């Protein structure tokens, strides 16, 4: 059994924001299997799919980004899933838009959802798939305003290209593991 977690914020005002691209990614995965989200274990919404014989639990923490670790730990404990079998999908301001990056482990890199998951698990050793949201090299005056802002029309076009590839990468992880997914998907998408 695998666990895929899409990070985001739960209120409707955050729909379509850069910070909620993790939610968009897992919604795309669930929809491709005809699965719907319902109340999950702890403070999350969950969908269940079977991919090539592998059971996959997909969750969207309803705790707000900065407390995502609570929902991850609750799902891991309930389903008895180990760290090697989880994949966290989130936005990454350090990656250019049009890029996804899978890693087997690592720091939070400034992403507060990942930071809380690391604190909650007591380890950086879990897979993550980061979706680049940086649109240019100009310095930002407010990181929070940018990540909580809605995608521009041009950015939406890029995200529509990325989401199916993100879905494929996540599903590759569930069957073949993080190393295989990294080898196949760590490259610019656009």
From Swiss-Prot:
Any one GO cellular component localisation term in the record: cytoplasm
Alphabetically ordered keywords of this record: Cytoplasm, Hydrolase, RNA-binding, tRNA-binding
CDD domains referenced in this protein's UniProt entry, alphabetically: PTH
Catalytic activity annotation: an N-acyl-L-alpha-aminoacyl-tRNA + H2O = an N-acyl-L-amino acid + a tRNA + H(+)
InterPro entries (UniProt xref): Pept_tRNA_hydro, Pept_tRNA_hydro_CS, Pept_tRNA_hydro_sf
Site (Stabilizes the basic form of H active site to accept a proton): 91
A GO BP annotation: rescue of stalled ribosome
Enzyme class: hydrolase
Active-site residues per Swiss-Prot or TrEMBL entry: 19 (proton acceptor)
Subcellular location: Cytoplasm
Record-listed tRNA binding positions: 14, 64, 66, 112
GO molecular function, a single term: peptidyl-tRNA hydrolase activity
Signal peptide annotation: none
Enzyme Commission number, as recorded: 3.1.1.29
Domain of life: Bacteria
Site features described as Discriminates between blocked and unblocked aminoacyl-tRNA, chain residue numbers: 9
Chief place of localization: cytoplasm
Glycosyltransferase in keyword set: no
Main function: Hydrolyzes ribosome-free peptidyl-tRNAs (with 1 or more amino acids incorporated), which drop off the ribosome during protein synthesis, or as a result of ribosome stalling.
Family matches, as PANTHER family: PEPTIDYL-TRNA HYDROLASE
Similarity remark: Belongs to the PTH family.
Assembly and binders: Monomer.
Name of this protein: Peptidyl-tRNA hydrolase
UniProt organism field: Pelodictyon phaeoclathratiforme (strain DSM 5477 / BU-1)
Protein encoded by which gene: pth
